[in-house]
Amino acid sequence: MTGKKSPNGLFAARKLRRKRLKFRWSEREFKIRMLGLKKKYDPLEGAPMARGIVLEKVGVEARQPNSAVRKCVRVQLIKNGRIVTAFVPGDGGLLVVDEHDEVLIEGIGGPRGRSMGDIPGVRYRVVTVNGVSLRAILEGRKQKPQR
């Protein structure tokens, strides 16, 4: 007769809990969270937002079944020099953003910090341009200052 794999009884709780904790290390998300690997490889280094300089404007083709050119910019982050691609939201948003502008970027809000919707490889979006909100500029409330 084979033995039971898990203990049972009134005083088995500690043993059961320890066993569960041991098996959690085989889960990918748990391991990434506990070892702090997201901060290590994240261009924003765990911060919610980051400032950067626009290097160039790029058009990213949308994934199937959509057909569009999503307006994005290549941004070099000030704090560590890494280059990321950021989506420019809004109608005419790319007309406002020029090369060498200083922009503030944040996560685009995709699942588990990844890209969102049909934009492949783009994890960030532009929030402000030269210290002024992109939305305010597009709505006509404020003017973009010249750098």
Curated annotation (Swiss-Prot):
GO terms for biological process: translation. With S4 and S5 plays an important role in translational accuracy. Located at the interface of the 30S and 50S subunits. Keywords: Ribonucleoprotein, Ribosomal protein, RNA-binding, rRNA-binding. It holds the Pfam family Ribosom_S12_S23. This is Small ribosomal subunit protein uS12. HAMAP family: Ribosomal_uS12_A (MF_00403_A). It comes from Hyperthermus butylicus (strain DSM 5456 / JCM 9403 / PLM1-5). The keyword Acyltransferase does not apply. GO terms for cellular component: small ribosomal subunit. GO terms for molecular function: rRNA binding; structural constituent of ribosome. Part of the 30S ribosomal subunit. Belongs to the universal ribosomal protein uS12 family. The keyword Ribonucleoprotein applies. PANTHER family: 30S RIBOSOMAL PROTEIN S12 FAMILY MEMBER (PTHR11652). The gene is rps12.
